[in-house]
Amino acid sequence: MVLELLKNNYERNDEHYYNEKVENNTSKHKKKKKKKKKHILVEESEKYDRNIDSENNEEAYNAYELIKTKPNNIYEEKYDFSFQNLDKKCLREKNNMRESYRNSKDIIQYGTNENDIFTEDMLENDNFDDDSFVEDDTMDYKTYNSYTKPEFNLFSKYSTESKKKNIMNNKKHSKIEDFYKKYKNNSEYSKQANEHDASIIQFLNNNKKSVDCGKMKDINFKKNDSQNYSESNKYKNEFFKNYNYDNKYTNNYAHDNNQDSNSYYYADENEPKDNHEEDNDTGDTYADNEEDEDNRDDNDDYSQYNQCEVESDTNQIRPNEKRYNESIKHINDSNLKINKELLLKRETYTKRDNIFYIKKDIIPYKKEHNNNRFSLYDSSKNNNEHNNNYEIKFMNYKKDSEKEGEQWLKNIKKEKDEEFLKKYMYENALKKTHSSKDLQFNRLDDEKNILHHDINVDNKMVRLDKYERSNIRDMRNKTNKCNMLRHDTAEFNKIRRKDEINNYSEYANKCLAGNIYEEDDSYILKRNELGHKELKVIDNPILNINPDDKKKPNIKSFLDKIKYRKNNELFLKNEHEKYVGIQETNKKDKIKMKFADILHTKNFSNFFHRGKNSIAKSLSPNNDKKNTSFNNEVFNLNILGKNDKNSDYKQYNINCSPYDHENTSFHPSVREETKYYENKESRKRLDYNCDEDNYIENSIQRYHENNIDYNSINIERTINLREDIKYNEFLNKPDKINSENFSNNFNDNKQKSLKNDDSNKIRDTNKLYYHDHLENTMRSNYIQKEYTEKISDILESNSNNMRKFINKMDYYTKKYEQNLYKNDEDIYTKENKFPDSRKEFYNKSDSPMKVTDGIKDSQYENYNRIKYKLKMKQEKQDKEDETDINIDKKLSRKMIENNKLKEENESNDELIVTPFYIKSKIDKVLKNSEIFERSARATFKQFDVKNKNFLHFSEIESLIQKLCYNLELPPVDKKILSIVYKDYDSSKNNCMNYMDFRQMYWDLLKQIKKKYYPTKNFKIKRNCIISRKKLQGYDYSSIYNYLSFKKILGCGAFGEVHLVEDNICKLYKVVKILKKKKMKNIKVNEEINVLIYLDHPNIIKIFDVYESVNCTYIVMELCEGGELMNKIKKPQIFSETYIKNIMFQILCAIAYMHSNNIAHKDLKPENILFKTDGYDTLKIIDFGLAELINKSEGISKTAAGTVLYMAPEVFKKKFTIKCDIWSAGVIMYFLFTKSLPFTGNTYEEVKQNIFNSEPDYQFLKLKMSKPALHLLKLMLEKDYSRRPMAAVLLHHPWFQGYFDPIDILPSTLNNIKSYMKHSNIRNVIVNIMAHELCVINNHVKYINDIFLKIDSNHNGSLSHREIYNVLSNAGVKKWDINRIIQALDVNDKGCITYTEFIAGCYRWKNIDSTFLKAAFNKIDKDEDGYISKSDLATLVHDNGVNNKDIENFFISVHSIKKNITKDKKINKISFEDFKDYMLSTF
């Protein structure tokens, strides 16, 4: 009890303790005078007002008492104790610390200075009364987080003369700094600079920075060229792309040799590169986004200058761009000159040469130029980026044609060949009736290339559309034009053989004829089909042949000329025959036009028959001839296509897409639907529907709605129902239902039998419709029966594909709907409906179906029964969906409620007074004499109610009780208080005056502070526990002094991992060796700094770091349980409870990292290890890609990680720390299903799946509970703004069991209470031992579980409030709680870390001596085998540490020995002495 201390320390020598100290210190104060005035308070403030050794304060106060009696002017001039001389810089530092305690866990981030001692400014609370510790009950006693006026100045009430001097000096100093700072290229200061300053900055940047850059680069820096790109860059400049002609894609990710085959690492291509060369090593997962520390200072100016200049120069054309534009313009000018010559030659010649040219985009990475497909009508794929002219040759395909190309190009340029070509082309032109038609020549601007003959190129095969060609006169209005130019064939014609001449000339004649109704429109295509050959496009650019070569005699060309002349007569005969055939087809076209008009009158539905008459076929809407008239296209019902019997297209495979028929080499030939108008249903359509065009439009719409799955084609081909004789008998019956009007694969496969069947003729139109309907029903029933029997085997073997096929076969359900109702009820989907036509038919009173009422009733009953079942299934599914939605809402609401409850608990107004708040309040009163005087006088007046200027014992008793309550002290013993009262009462008549009370009040506060709220002068930072040593020399010999290598555990591109044994403490550990030569651009220190700072039970610990010239050695804890991936690969199925435990630990570690703004960026099962085989404690490793994301921005652009686990926003290179949540969701999916949710064979395929696909959540309902599924959906949310943080997810109802009340074992409470009784230096040593504690047993696992449960906000550290709640529920007194909290918080940071918590809770009594040896070696910095005072000062990196505390520690160590007296000075401690002392304290 404090009063007992006062009683024992009080000495009755006619003067009180307080006044006695005044006399003793008066002489000391006179000697120092101004020196103490200037320096004492400054020294105290530089220690953040934490030095509570009150000797200096007492001296200052005593001086104040002595000088108080002097005149006022003397006091004001010479002695100023109002603390106005406190350094302004310290004031700013204190103000910066305001509210730091309330949000200490959020503010203390990675990289902060841990030397800063936590302090509390009491004036942050405007309601706090500095003058009293014993406020009235009506006063609000605020807690540490109730600060409202951080701007309030502590010393604003006092004189400011010396403060003004400091302010003026600081202003002068700041002006000088700002003057130089202004001309530094600082983006933050640039916002405050005026225009004049900006011009100066720009001048300095343009001169100094460029010179520095030139020196660094060893080049002359060019003006207006602020950014230099290397040849390896993706783009050469801002406007023109540099294509990769070798590879189609660039490899943006590297495969690590250490990782699984499916792990790919993706790095940002646009990250800034270092200025030095890199080794071409691959395989590691590091992503370097900054320059090395060695080059950072040198490159800073250059990088800033470039960054400043890029924006200003974006609109300027750089020299390399000018050269590129000039080369383009030169090519354009040359092409323009050639085309001008062509125009001149066109005027001189009356003959026409039909040369085709193609304008085509250059795709460098596709090397299939020689097999292209082109279309005369499709203009959607034109692109004017590259206007190179190419010549098309139509030739019979031969494999050896490419070998003779170069030689042939030389031979065809001869004059004699040209004259011959001119002759026969002139003769051909004379035969044409439409020779007067001149096609348009397109000329573009002078800066662009001239478009000669534009034929759009699609794919590998040549394709000419016969159905969408328009009139030649209208072709000049389209983009794709086939213009025939008159020009010199000696320069541009490259015809090789007789067959090529025939093909080319015949096609040219057809084009010149311009008759779009002729039958042989695609003459070349048919010629190709007959010869089983293909057309070929040669994309060789036009070569300018040297004119001197034309004059040289060439024997070969002469022989070719004779050969051509011999064949000329046969050629002319063929041309004449074709011309006669054209005239005949013109007559047929006129007849076609007449019957096409008749067709639209809707009066001749019975005109068509099954004969082979060509006129009848030409009138059929499904005829394979073209029926276009003046650009009015006829809809092709058989859009699926059918193989032409004379083509090699029969082996073509149709892909699973409704539009794949458009990608074939030719348009699919139209099926001859001879039964189109012969059935009753068709006639009914013509009679009752409005017109044919509307019906066709409806057919198109229904076709697109059906979205047929074309995989059914292969299934039906497998069945091959055409060979079924019984089926052919039914096919002979001409009746068809309405769905037959649609082209489907089922009918297409039977078309051959339909064509060969002579019995398919027009039926008598007078037959009753109900007979047709009965026959149709029998036919469909039988077909369906046979069909279902034959596909049963396929259904068994490929059920999933068949299910998808049936779901999409709308045309199938329409055609055989009635029969399907009877045979197979389970394959229906929601799209099955009773046909509208059949409903209307039943509703008609005069329907002939009245004759067959029995059949109708049975069918209708079946329909109602199936409809009812479908309705019930739909209702059940709707209920399940509604239940899922309600559960999701309920779970989300519950998670939000849990988080709100957590926030309310943190911000409630209960009076939970933390020890730091009380300590800071006591420190403020004891450090400032004037504040103490005010506090003592206010307390005295508060209890002197009658203003009698003295206090009775009863009043003193009430005062002490109130003081103990506010400062959370034990209750007062009345007997001891009466003794103390008598000792301090100088009047001896039960009347204590103010002077006596002031002395007692001073002594009482000092004793309270010493026992209950002591100051910790010996503090250790975490980076002091992890030692970093530099090894001497280039060899590895020195590392063997510390570690013994046992075996290699793994190796990668940048280093190796070994199992080692510590030579000193004999503990097994793991060392990661990183070779510096292979890691020039990867900062090893980033990973080391992150691991040093992070302290969590689920994150790997590091012990030591050794650095040599060649390598860096990182010593980490050993995890013997192996990777999580190894357990996933095993066939064992995990229970949901097991997965929940794993996910809880992962999310706890993620929440801790995110609270410190650290993103791991490479979470995957390979980077999650089990500590031991017997326990499921996890450790997250490999922080090589970890990044500290700025809290203000919250966005990173350094994309890195393993592709299979990367979040969608990482691919966009704009992501937050929530990318780790996505990776955890993928791991959770992996644990439940043993498969990844997003896979692919290539990087691009995986990327597209991540962006576009969703996991099969319906399948997951069978494998996990609904809360688990809801949590998984939240984690795999593609929009990261809607993806919750890890701390929020940990309050999800799935983790409800982890929120149960925490019961702390009595043994653990005893360990904590014993821990609080020892000195701070001893507890620091125990913390070092706790860090070296790398074993996992039941006791350690229990402590880990308690730590995670106490951490209610899941930020990885325990606040004083969280500890207070748990210990108070355990029955610990609040004054003991304050002492426990202060003992656990070794560094006074305001929160308790994992290592500090385990140091106080662990049972150290039976600890192995190896951990004591490890702690001893950490303290023994000079490695001489002894702990000296200098070693302790070096350990805390503070040479000014209080020597008194260290001396007390040395005395305590040697006091356990009987032979050593306390008076003997001891300067060293051996390991044996250290061991005996530590074991005695446990």
From Swiss-Prot:
Question: Start and end of every Protein kinase domain?
Answer: 1043-1295
Q: What is the protein name for this chain?
A: Calcium-dependent protein kinase 6
Task: List the taxonomic lineage.
Answer: Eukaryota, Sar, Alveolata, Apicomplexa, Aconoidasida
The positions annotated for binding Ca(2+) 2 are D1351, N1353, N1355, S1357, E1362
Which residues of this UniProt protein bind Ca(2+) 3?
D1420, D1422, D1424, Y1426, D1431
Q: How is its activity regulated?
A: Activated by calcium.
User: What does this gene product do?
Assistant: Calcium-dependent protein kinase which acts as a sensor and effector of intracellular Ca(2+) levels. In sporozoites, probably involved in the secretion of the cysteine protease that cleaves circumsporozoite protein CSP, thereby exposing CSP TSR domain, which binds with high affinity to highly sulfated heparan sulfate proteoglycans (HSPGs), resulting in productive invasion of the host hepatocytes.
Q: Which organism is it from?
A: Plasmodium berghei (strain Anka)
Q: Where is this region: Disordered?
A: 250-320, 739-760
Q: Where is the active site?
A: D1162 (proton acceptor)
Where composition is biased (Low complexity), the residues are 739-748
Polar residues: compositionally biased ranges: 254-264, 302-318
Q: What is known of its domains?
A: The EF-hand domains 1, 4 and 6 appear to lack a functional calcium binding site.
Give the Gene Ontology MF terms in alphabetical order. ATP binding; calcium ion binding; protein serine/threonine kinase activity
Acidic residues composition-biased segments = 277-301
Q: What range(s) does the EF-hand domain occupy?
A: 931-966, 972-1007, 1338-1373, 1376-1406, 1407-1442, 1468-1482
Q: Which InterPro entries match?
A: CDPK_Ser/Thr_kinases (IPR050205), EF-hand-dom_pair (IPR011992), EF_Hand_1_Ca_BS (IPR018247), EF_hand_dom (IPR002048), Kinase-like_dom_sf (IPR011009), Prot_kinase_dom (IPR000719), Ser/Thr_kinase_AS (IPR008271)
Task: Give the UniProt keywords, A-Z.
Answer: ATP-binding, Calcium, Kinase, Magnesium, Metal-binding, Nucleotide-binding, Repeat, Serine/threonine-protein kinase, Transferase
Basic and acidic residues: compositionally biased ranges: 749-760
Annotated residues that bind ATP are located at L1049, G1050, C1051, G1052, A1053, F1054, G1055, E1056, V1057, K1072
